[in-house]
Regions:
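Long, contiguous binding/interaction regions
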Residues: 1-45, 49-165
Length: 165
C-alpha cells in the first residue's frame, strides 16, 4: 500500500541527502518526492510517497524523527488529505488530430501551454490517478516528451503540519 509522508525539515544543504540516504540504507523505495520552502524560509516541507505496510511506515517515521534536521513527521491518513501532481506533456500531432487532443484536454481540464504547427504541449494539475489516466488517453497520439512532478499533499480540514510560532 502506498503511504504519503509529510516531513518538516530545517532548510539547509544536505538535509535531503540524509533523508534519501536513510531510505536507501533501510531498503525503502521512494515512489515520489517533492520538496519546497514553507512560509518560513528556514523550513522546508518534503512530501514522500512510499510503498509499504503499516509496520514499514512506522519504522520510516521513527528513523526520520531521529535525524537532527527533521522538525516534524506525519504520515497522512488515507482519504484525509488532498494530493496533486503536475504534468507537462508534449504531443507530436498534425492538424488532422489537433481537435481530438484539444477535446481530451478540455474534458480533463488540462491547459494548452504551447502550440506549434507540429506539437501541442499540455499542462495538468490533478491527482496521481487522473494524471495517469490523461497520459493513457494521449499515448495513441504519440507522446514526444513528458515531465511529472512528485506528489504534494496537504491534510483536509483544520489540522495542519506546521511549526508553532
Amino acid at each position: 500500500m502506498k503511504h504519503t509522508i509529510s516531513v518538516l525539515v530545517e532548510n539547509h544543504a544536505g538535509v535531503l541527502s540524509r533523508i534519501s540516504g536513510l531510505f536507501s540504507r533501510r531498503g525503502f523505495n521512494i515512489d515520489s518526492l517533492a520538496v519546497g520552502v514553507t512560509d518560513n524560509p528556514e523550513i522546508s516541507r518534503i512530501t514522500i510517497v512510499a510503498e509499504g505496510n503499516d509496520y514499514t511506515v512506522e519504522q520510516i517515521e521513527k528513523q526520520l524523527n531521529k535525524l537532527i534536521d527533521v522538525i516534524k513527521v506525519r504520515t497522512l491518513p488515507a482519504h484525509e488529505f488532498l494530493q496533486r501532481e503536475l504534468l507537462m506533456i508534449k504531443i507530436n500531432v498534425g492538424a488532422d488530430k489537433r481537435s481530438e487532443i484539444m477535446t481530451i484536454a478540455e474534458i480533463m481540464n488540462a491547459k494548452i501551454i504551447d502550440l506549434t504547427h507540429t506539437t501541442v504541449t499540455l499542462e495538468l494539475s490533478d491527482t496521481t490517478y487522473h494524471i495517469a489516466r490523461f497520459e493513457e488517453m494521449l499515448k495513441p497520439y504519440g507522446i514526444t516528451e513528458i515531465v511529472r512532478t512528485g506528489a504534494i499533499a496537504i491534510q483536509k480540514g483544520s489540522d495542519a503540519l506546521q511549526v508553532k510560532k
